[in-house]
UniProtKB/Swiss-Prot annotation:
Function summary: One of the primary rRNA binding proteins, it binds directly to 16S rRNA where it nucleates assembly of the head domain of the 30S subunit. Is located at the subunit interface close to the decoding center, probably blocks exit of the E-site tRNA.
Family, per entry: Belongs to the universal ribosomal protein uS7 family.
Taxonomic lineage from the root: Bacteria, Pseudomonadati, Bacteroidota, Bacteroidia, Bacteroidales
Record key words, sorted: Ribonucleoprotein, Ribosomal protein, RNA-binding, rRNA-binding, tRNA-binding
BP-aspect Gene Ontology terms: translation
Domain of life: Bacteria
Organism this protein belongs to: Azobacteroides pseudotrichonymphae genomovar. CFP2
Name the UniProt record assigns to this protein: Small ribosomal subunit protein uS7
Length: 158
């Protein structure tokens, strides 16, 4: 176990939207330190989202943030061993972890999609998440259902 809690690193905001949340998402999207390529993928995905949802009054960044909020889980289950039996104990997720889980799920399910480029796949996943559909939304609902099913073990708090 580590001696002290690690310090939080300061994340710089991105150049186009001035948002730290965008930079955090791009950091999760990035492979092999190629951040400029990850930013290009993200911005082109947002342009494609804007084209797909042209009738929406929101900007592409607002659509992306709404999609992230739609797939953000509220509770998760953690394994807890009590007297030889392992229970799945539902616990609330703290805000920073909620955001990280939703970003990673969106990227994971975008990568699993069939499509030409990552920008196409990411834009399709953003549109699906905005409409409360897709793999990332299903994952959130599965987490919620698992926590609901194991609600009886909620008194085994951590």
């Amino acid at each position: 176990m580590r001696k002290a809690k690690p310090k939080k690193r300061q994340i710089l905001s991105d150049a186009v939207f001035g948002s730290q949340r965008v930079t955090k998402f791009v950091n999760h999207l990035m492979y092999d330190g190629k951040k400029s390529m990850a930013f290009n993928i993200f911005y082109s995905a947002l342009e494609k989202v804007r084209a797909k949802l042209s009738d929406e009054q929101k900007s592409s960044l607002e659509i992306w943030e709404h999609a992230l909020n739609n797939i953000t889980p509220l509770v998760e289950v953690k394994s807890r061993r009590v007297g030889g039996a392992t229970f799945q104990v539902p616990t609330e997720i703290y805000p920073e972890r909620k955001e990280t889980i939703s970003m990673k799920n969106m990227i994971f399910f975008a990568r699993k999609r069939d499509g030409k480029s990552m920008a196409d796949k990411l834009s399709a996943e953003i549109v699906d998440a905005f409409n409360s559909q897709g793999g990332a939304y299903k994952k959130k609902e599965d987490m919620r259902k698992m926590a609901e099913a194991n609600r009886a073990f909620a008194y085994f708090r951590f």
